[in-house]
Amino acid sequence: MNNHSYLKKNSFHEGDARELLKCIEEESIALSVWSPPYHVGKKYEEGQTYEQWSSLLTKVIALHYPILKPGGFLVINIDDILAFPDPRMPRFQAVNLKKHRVSVTREDILNALKLEPELTKYQLAKKFNCSEQTIERRLKGNNIRGGKYNVQTKVKLAGPVLEKAAEEAGLYLYDRRIWAKDPAWQNSQWHSNSYKAVSEFEHLYIFWKPGETVIDRNKLSKEEWASWASRGIWYIPSVRKNDDHEAKFPLLLPQRLIKLLTQKGDTVLDCFMGSGTTAVAALSESRNFIGIEKEPKYIQLSNKNVETFYISRNKEASKIKETNHSVTDEKKKAEQLELLLEENENSL
């Protein structure tokens, strides 16, 4: 591929990561950090099977080897336990007693049918003072998490898929961090229909491409090394508002990874860019970025967020400039006053 065909830095590129990653200059990426589809009920994940998901991740990871610098890193942020639709999975029968508006049980109905086998569900409903739907649910066991018509979900671990795909690509697990976030779905009906824990943390799988890695302990302060850079658990609050994108991670997350694993002037990649958070983090730390995103509306959102960053930074620079001018003016006034006092003293 000639130089003019490479994806432009500090730009967002619309398309499928499996195609556009082939258009990045070889050994030009110091860090790739991204979060793939999570399979936690988001609209854009609907209908994707476990096999399709693992195939997507395997292909994307494989395409990273040529473009990463030797000694560079790939970081994948992901919830390690994911749920996928699987028609072979037995249905989970969740009888939620709290939601029963009437006290009639399956045993009550069966006992009534023993005495009067000819009773219809409508007659049973009248007998127990409930709806015929309640009779049907009790008899047929339709108290099922996910609904009686939806395909049941199967829980899978993400980590083994990522590690296997990375090793096949020539990348090796270097480290793993835990992002401790706010508990998710605390007020959700899903939570009330399960004994499962709400999601309170995610993993950061850090993979390394063999080669020379620069270790510079001076690029972070002693406080940064002590509080997070050398720690396995990062306590970072979740994004408070996901009104413009369903799965945003906080700015501080890619910011820390960029500060820790790259140098100023390096290029950072996010091939599932979403709302542009990684791009803003890269720019804020004096790095370049390349963003890939298949949804046009999120390309627009990313551009908007980068524009907002530049406006904010320019305002900050103007304030600093004004402050410096003010300090300079005050210094000049002080020097002039000191000179006048000295002249006055000499004249006495």
From Swiss-Prot:
Belongs to the N(4)/N(6)-methyltransferase family. It comes from the Bacteria. Signal peptide: none annotated. Keywords: DNA-binding, Methyltransferase, Restriction system, S-adenosyl-L-methionine, Transferase. It catalyses: a 2'-deoxycytidine in DNA + S-adenosyl-L-methionine = an N(4)-methyl-2'-deoxycytidine in DNA + S-adenosyl-L-homocysteine + H(+). InterPro entries: DNA_methylase_N4/N6, RM_Methyltransferase, SAM-dependent_MTases_sf, WH-like_DNA-bd_sf. It is an enzyme of class 2 (transferase). This is Type II methyltransferase M.BglI. Gene3D superfamilies: Vaccinia Virus protein VP39, Winged helix-like DNA-binding domain superfamily/Winged helix DNA-binding domain. The lineage of its organism: Bacteria, Bacillati, Bacillota, Bacilli, Bacillales. One of its GO terms (biological process) is methylation. One of its GO terms (molecular function) is N-methyltransferase activity. The keyword Phosphoprotein does not apply. Its EC number is 2.1.1.113.
